[in-house]
């Protein structure tokens, strides 16, 4: 083919330009998926002022404040200043709670191993009489719900309650002494209620944590240990011998929120350094810095919801069903309902 023939307009028609090759369409981006609605969000709302004050009076074992003065007075302002001093001082904080127990780190590491031997764990547990009793008690509770009529020894108890049950039994035994107090002081009078509430929060926290994608045991520990803030707060107040305070002054509607914020700060300052697990350390720092009402982490949300539900449980009149006392009860997940109902029946 000559160049002349190619270009001569009378001897060859110009062919229409070929259509450009189609450009491959970019793969369609999936539409953003909205986060699933939290079915337990109804219990995430703050307690009313009346509920909050009633719960404070229950857990701290002080009388209701129907005849409280309009102003809490300068003594309370001085109290807050002293509490802030304690919160900011590692030396002063160290006097409020026993040091974090380190007697069982090897056992805890063993329990995190999927291939742990129940016999090996039983041998370790058998060295502690109190822990042995707690493990067998937990297994007996499981046994009573089943049809097995065999005898429960320690090795069998370890197998029956499983890893999560063991961790909880160990946590209860090791951490319970932190909440104990004696004498006629604010902390001593409140000790039983603080522990009862901590146990409720721990059990609820384990269930709620799993629904927020968090290890249930981290939820259990966070719920159990959050109340160390109450214990530390009241022990600090007990130690202020130069400040004369009544329960009515502590339970004043303007004082309770200030005390609760300092409870959270003490929880963060005391529990954070214990290095129990990364999620627990992080939630302790978050609660300590922001307060329980402002947390955003998954474990923080589980802890806050557990705290709300535990408060409803404490405030429920005898004989009242959960549907009457818990907001939007029917919307809660079945596992949360079951856990709450079990606590209410105890």
Model-derived features: positions:
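Conserved alpha-helical "signature site"
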Residues: 2-225, 230-239, 250-346
């Amino acid at each position: 083919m000559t160049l002349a023939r190619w270009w001569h307009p009378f001897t060859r028609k110009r062919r229409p330009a070929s259509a450009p090759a189609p450009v491959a369409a970019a793969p369609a981006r999936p539409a953003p998926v909205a986060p699933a609605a939290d079915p337990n969000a109804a219990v995430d709302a703050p307690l009313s002022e009346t509920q909050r004050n009633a719960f404070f009076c229950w857990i701290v074992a002080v009388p209701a404040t129907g005849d409280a003065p309009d102003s809490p007075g300068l003594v309370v302002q001085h109290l807050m200043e002293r509490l802030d001093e304690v919160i900011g001082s590692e030396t002063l904080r160290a006097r409020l709670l026993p040091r974090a127990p380190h007697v069982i780190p090897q056992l805890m590491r063993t329990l995190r191993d999927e291939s742990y031997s129940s016999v090996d764990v039983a041998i370790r547990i058998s060295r502690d009489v109190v822990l042995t009793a707690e493990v067998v008690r937990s297994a007996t509770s499981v046994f009573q719900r089943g049809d097995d009529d065999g005898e429960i020894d320690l090795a069998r108890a370890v197998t029956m309650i499983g890893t999560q049950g063991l961790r909880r039994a160990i946590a209860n035994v090791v951490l319970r002494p932190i909440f104990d107090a004696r004498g006629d002081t604010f902390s001593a009078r409140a000790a039983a209620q603080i522990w009862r509430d901590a146990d409720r929060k721990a059990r609820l926290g384990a269930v709620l944590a799993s629904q927020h994608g968090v290890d249930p045991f981290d939820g259990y520990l966070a719920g159990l240990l959050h109340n160390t803030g109450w214990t530390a707060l009241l022990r600090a107040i007990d130690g202020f011998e130069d400040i004369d305070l009544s329960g009515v002054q502590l339970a004043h509607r303007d004082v309770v929120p200030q005390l609760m914020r300092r409870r959270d700060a003490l929880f963060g300052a005391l529990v954070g350094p214990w290095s129990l697990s990364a999620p627990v350390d992080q939630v302790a720092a978050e609660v300590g810095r922001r307060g329980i009402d402002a947390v955003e982490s998954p474990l923080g949300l589980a802890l806050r919801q557990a705290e709300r539900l535990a408060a409803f449980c404490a405030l429920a009149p005898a004989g009242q069903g959960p549907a009457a006392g818990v907001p939007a009860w029917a919307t809660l997940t079945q596992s949360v309902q079951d856990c709450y109902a079990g606590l209410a029946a105890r």
